[in-house]
């Protein structure tokens, strides 16, 4: 009987999963879904149980159903994606954000969230354009972007991110709508790899473009 709050049910299911009582959790979720088949959280929980048991097809079916039930509401999309991220299903979180963009008719929605997911997937080729677009729309996010890149570099064992950053910076230099924030990004990166001469060159360029000539981007 569904006499308990939604929070109680969530914790109950989590306890069953953590205790590896998959059969009991599966039966409970199936009963709940019979009376509430639109509950995306239950679908993801059921999919996770299948995934833990190696039932990939059933798992993907549940995850796919959850995404199809998304409504065009920013909070609902973020909550569903967070549910996927909590179980480290970043590729499904990405699909959630992408579907959310379509529903909201906002192609630039969830830039940071998508970038963070690609970072966790170590898909730097997909990540960098999202970070660049974020800087284009909001140059003030440079500190957040460089912090994310620092995190990625510190966890990049095979040195696969630096070539992507360098390729991105090179392509940015060829843009007709080159922005000062790209110089900030270049200064930061070249300081990380100790290419001080190039860092200085970009710092001078940045200072020349600054409206406030007292702003000297040198330390």
Predicted regions span which residues?
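Short coil turns that delineate tetratricopeptide repeat
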Residues: 3-4, 37, 71-72, 104-105, ...
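Register position in tetratricopeptide repeats
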Residues: 18, 52, 86-87, 120-121, ...
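TPR alpha-solenoid repeat register
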Residues: 8, 42, 76, 110, ...
